[in-house]
């Protein structure tokens, strides 16, 4: 019989309410079942969720629902990464308080996420701007401080003189602030740091144990930590060329084997020697100031033009005292890396080669590819950076680079300069301590008091939290906490004298570096309940974007180590499994060119397709607009699809199904209206074929068939169940969905026959069993549809609380095997035959293949070799 179309606008809110009333997804920490903690990176409350959120949280929800059905006690929480600059920018632009802006956005986005039907434990929800959360973060800071994991030091920062704030390197564009356009200044500010470098080697070593992380992410972290083994080498300065007190310059190098190719030394603009020379040399001072006006990130240095200035200082080559090299200040050397000084070997480093060509410095090839022409090898436009054989290198000539490395290390380590060895082996790390100070209001206050008598004093825990004041204004640039009339003034907790609060707040990466531990017991007075945290941690499956591969994930790994040192957790690693999903991308549409180009949202367009050509027209005027490239959905390009619109038109299950089904989960998914409509047709088809057969299946006890009419449906269902189970274990959502499509196709006919009536009980029992398997394997992806179908069959209870089905082994075994048939070693065909067929039967069947018969032409083969269930080889 015909049934009404599935109506998600009616069904989805109804089942969401039922799940909520029955507290289906509220997790009990005392539940004795095996735990499974699944977590998606929590969102910044920017205003509305986007399709990237839908994909991310749909993936996590599939994992949570699947693991719950498999019998695990699942923890699947949600919160908000709520501090940060966007709220302050909104405050300045819209005259709204950051707190109000943030909590309004949270309310909107919470409603959107709930409309997706996510199996979240909302009782554990928090925002990082909640006083209750940052109170515990301040307690952690105090504990870290007591453990020696926090310190203050003068640090160079990018200062925007218009916005009165520190800028990250990435926010400095061509020497100017990204928002104000002002020329950025390099300033020395006293900053707070976490000692992440205390754990450099451990953070590196433990990467090998994270075998459920993408290899790409582990490699990115390995490179960021940047362990290198090299030589710390002192170069003697030539008398009368260097200021007093600078008798030598220390350089760290990983390529001491290339020393005979050195043609210059380069030091950073903030090297002590550069500062000393700047005091008396205006040209050097001006050049150093220019270096400080540009971004200090490695990326900025890589792309910037290589510049330098000869200081007039010269150094003696450590392996040849007759050889003197010039010392330059160079814009590509950073004080924060190594010693702030390098030696340049132009033939072995492209940056050094470009610099040498620009300033007319010698280029001596010292490493050549192995071969008979090695001695005559030269370098012109491209440096030779590979290993090879040493040339033009005195006693090193003919050695391989690895042997030359050791020879130089041994020689210089035994050589004295002054009263100490001229060189020593050293392990260096690229990783630097984490500067957490931010000169802004909307962040977690650093719980420290500055007293002229006692110095720096941590706020006693009994006086925590240090709350942000609400009565602040954003009418002038800068940090409102600096100019607050009362908040910053406080008595010293040690001596009682007048003192002042720290007005810097914490980097928002701090907030997201420990939130996963707080979810385990968010009601506790302490940051964690260690026993509960140790039960749940590490997170079994963490899901988020590849853009967080380094900073967020590395900082989180530091935090678990620091929290372990201070007794809050017992684990080292925060995340056992990591999955980085692809983005949701969409075509771009625009009208006009150049400066007059205007981006057009897809909702304002009509798309027409004729003979494979797609054209876009404005709905309002019919004007044709240009279809551009497919890019990440962004507000700037207006190629954004609002999830609310999709859910209102098609339902949450359709949106979920599309973002899960269209491509492998680690790749980008291209949003298309046709794809969404296809997903919706599938949802409607599942409802139709089950709904039409539901009356005939009510009251029928499910039982798979072992023979006869129902066998095909039972085999299809149980084989699909086994395959989907394997796919979901590997997070291969798109593969699981492809198999479900096939199962629906396989069941459509048998269910139509059942719906027509007159089928015997055993056939209906097999159909009921197959349908219940279908419903339960679609439940993680399309949970509302699954509940509606489950209810239509007359089942009591919820699919969300129903165990995962078990496949029948005999129904998933293949009784036949496919064996390739070769003639004289060349494949000529395939043979499908019973798995238990004897060799004579296989031999006879192989000889009956048409391709084999034509080759034999009535003759007999010399030999037939049968490898059981594998291959047949016929020799003629």
Curated annotation (Swiss-Prot):
It catalyses: tRNA(Leu) + L-leucine + ATP = L-leucyl-tRNA(Leu) + AMP + diphosphate. PROSITE patterns: AA_TRNA_LIGASE_I. Keywords: Aminoacyl-tRNA synthetase, ATP-binding, Cytoplasm, Ligase, Nucleotide-binding, Protein biosynthesis. ATP binds at residue 635. It is an enzyme of class 6 (ligase). Its main location: cytoplasm. Its EC number is 6.1.1.4. GO terms for cellular component: cytosol. The keyword Chloroplast does not apply. One of its GO terms (molecular function) is ATP binding. This is Leucine--tRNA ligase. Disulfide bonds: none annotated. It comes from the Bacteria. Signal peptide: none annotated. Belongs to the class-I aminoacyl-tRNA synthetase family. A motif ('KMSKS' region) lies at residues 632-636. A motif ('HIGH' region) lies at residues 43-53. The gene is leuS. One of its GO terms (biological process) is leucyl-tRNA aminoacylation. SUPFAM superfamilies: Anticodon-binding domain of a subclass of class I aminoacyl-tRNA synthetases, Nucleotidylyl transferase, ValRS/IleRS/LeuRS editing domain. It is found in: Cytoplasm.
């Amino acid at each position: 019989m015909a049934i009404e179309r599935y109506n998600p606008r009616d069904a989805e809110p109804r089942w969401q309410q039922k799940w909520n009333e029955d507290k289906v997804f509220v997790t009990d920490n005392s539940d004795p079942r095996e735990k499974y903690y699944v977590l998606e990176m929590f969102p910044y409350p920017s205003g509305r969720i986007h399709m990237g959120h839908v994909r991310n949280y749909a993936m996590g929800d599939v994992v949570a629902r699947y693991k719950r059905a498999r019998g695990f006690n699942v923890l699947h929480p949600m919160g908000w990464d709520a501090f940060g600059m966007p709220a302050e920018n909104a405050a300045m632009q819209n005259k709204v308080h950051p707190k109000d802006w943030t909590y309004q956005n949270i309310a909107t986005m919470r409603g959107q996420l709930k409309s997706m039907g996510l199996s979240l434990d909302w009782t554990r929800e928090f925002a990082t701007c909640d006083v209750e959360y940052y109170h515990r973060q301040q307690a952690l800071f105090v504990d870290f401080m007591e453990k020696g994991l926090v310190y203050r030091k003068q640090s160079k920062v990018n200062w925007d003189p218009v916005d009165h704030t520190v800028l990250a390197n990435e926010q400095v564009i061509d020497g100017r602030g990204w928002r104000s356009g002002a020329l950025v200044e390099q300033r020395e500010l006293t900053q707070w740091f976490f000692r992440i470098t205390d754990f450099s080697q451990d953070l590196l070593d433990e990467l090998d144990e994270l075998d459920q992380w993408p290899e790409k992410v582990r490699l990115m972290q390995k490179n960021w930590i940047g362990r290198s083994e090299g030589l710390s080498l002192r170069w003697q300065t030539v008398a009368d060329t260097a200021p007093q007190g600078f008798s030598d310059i220390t350089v760290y190098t990983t390529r001491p084997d290339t020393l005979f190719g050195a043609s210059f030394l380069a030091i950073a603009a903030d090297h002590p020697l550069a500062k000393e020379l700047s005091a008396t040399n205006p040209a050097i001072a001006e050049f150093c100031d220019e270096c400080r006006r540009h971004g200090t990130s490695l990326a900025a240095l890589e792309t910037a033009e290589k510049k330098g200035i000869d200081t007039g200082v010269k150094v003696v080559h450590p392996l040849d005292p007759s050889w003197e090299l010039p010392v330059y200040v160079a814009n590509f050397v950073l004080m924060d890396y190594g010693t702030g000084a390098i030696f340049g070997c132009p033939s072995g480093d492209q940056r050094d080669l470009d610099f040498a060509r620009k300033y007319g410095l010698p280029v001596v090839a010292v490493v050549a590819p192995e071969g008979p022409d090695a001695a005559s090898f030269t370098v012109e436009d491209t440096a030779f950076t590979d290993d090879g054989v040493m040339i033009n290198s005195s006693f090193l000539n003919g050695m391989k680079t690895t042997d030359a490395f050791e020879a130089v290390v041994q020689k210089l380590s035994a050589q004295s300069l002054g009263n100490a060895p001229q060189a020593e082996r050293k392990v260096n790390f690229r990783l630097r301590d984490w500067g957490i100070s931010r000169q802004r209001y909307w962040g977690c206050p650093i719980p420290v008091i500055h007293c002229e008598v006692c110095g720096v004093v941590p706020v006693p825990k009994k006086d925590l939290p240090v709350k942000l004041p609400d009565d602040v204004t954003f009418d002038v640039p800068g940090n409102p906490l600096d100019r607050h009339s009362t908040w910053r003034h406080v008595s010293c907790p040690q001596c009682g004298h007048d003192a002042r609060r720290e007005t810097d707040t914490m980097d928002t990466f701090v907030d997201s570096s420990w939130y996963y531990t707080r979810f385990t017991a968010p009601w506790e007075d302490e940051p964690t309940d260690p026993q509960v945290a140790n039960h749940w941690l590490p997170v079994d499956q963490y899901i988020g974007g590849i853009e967080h591969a380094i900073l967020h994930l590395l900082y989180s790994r530091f935090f678990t180590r620091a929290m372990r040192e201070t007794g809050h957790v017992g684990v080292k690693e925060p995340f056992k499994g990591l999955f980085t999903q692809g983005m949701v991308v969409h075509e771009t549409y625009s009208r006009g060119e150049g400066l007059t180009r205007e981006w057009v949202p897809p909702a304002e367009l009509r798309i027409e397709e004729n003979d494979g050509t797609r054209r876009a027209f404005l709905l309002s005027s019919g004007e044709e607009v240009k279809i551009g490239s497919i890019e990440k959905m962004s507000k700037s390009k207006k190629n954004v699809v609002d999830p609310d619109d999709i859910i209102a038109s098609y339902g949450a299950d359709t949106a979920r199904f599309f973002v899960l089904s269209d491509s492998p989960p680690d790749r980008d998914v291209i949003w298309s209206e046709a794809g969404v409509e296809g997903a919706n047709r599938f949802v409607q088809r599942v409802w139709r074929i089950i709904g039409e057969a539901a009356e005939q299946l009510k009251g029928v006890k499910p039982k798979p068939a072992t023979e006869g009419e129902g066998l095909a449906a039972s085999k299809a269902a149980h084989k699909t169940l086994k395959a989907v189970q394997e796919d979901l274990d590997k997070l291969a959502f798109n593969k699981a969905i492809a198999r479900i499509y096939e199962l629906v196709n396989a069941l459509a006919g048998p269910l139509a026959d059942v719906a027509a009536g007159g089928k015997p009980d055993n056939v209906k029992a097999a159909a009921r069993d197959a349908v219940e398997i279908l419903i339960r394997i679609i439940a993680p992806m399309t949970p509302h549809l699954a509940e509606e179908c489950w209810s239509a069959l007359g089942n009591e209870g919820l699919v969300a609380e129903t165990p995962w089905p078990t496949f029948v082994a005999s129904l998933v075994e293949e009784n036949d095997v496919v064996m390739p048939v070769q003639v004289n070693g060349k494949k000529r065909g395939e043979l499908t035959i019973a798995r238990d067929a004897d060799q004579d039967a296989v031999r006879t069947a192989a000889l009956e293949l048409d391709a084999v018969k034509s080759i034999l032409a009535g003759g007999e083969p010399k030999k037939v070799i049968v490898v059981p269930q594998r291959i047949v080889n016929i020799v003629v």
